[in-house]
Amino acid sequence: MCGIAGYFNPDQNYAENPKQNFHTLSRMINTMNHRGPDTYGHTIINSCCLAHTRLSIIDLENGRQPMSYTKDGNTYYIVYNGEIYNYKEVKKTLLRKNYTFETNSDTEVIIA
């Protein structure tokens, strides 16, 4: 089981004060560390801050979150808890449609 947390305000630019927001995200991560003891991550993107603690199941090294994916000049971010059982088949379909992948994680298949 993983832990996900974050906050969003379209009228704020959290990237302007990353130190304060990193402190807030760190406290959130510490609170939910028992839900994902293997690794953790965070990201601050303009009006959104995301945090994740991970219990590693698939792609132990490269499946860290929050994860980003860029396509056609747009960058998307995800924090996710779950498992996509047919992600290998979905990934094959997306590869035929010229999607590219940097990991073997089921999470990257979702965000693509």
Each language-model region and where it sits:
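N-terminus-centric sequence/structural signature that marks the extreme N-terminus
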Residues: 1-112
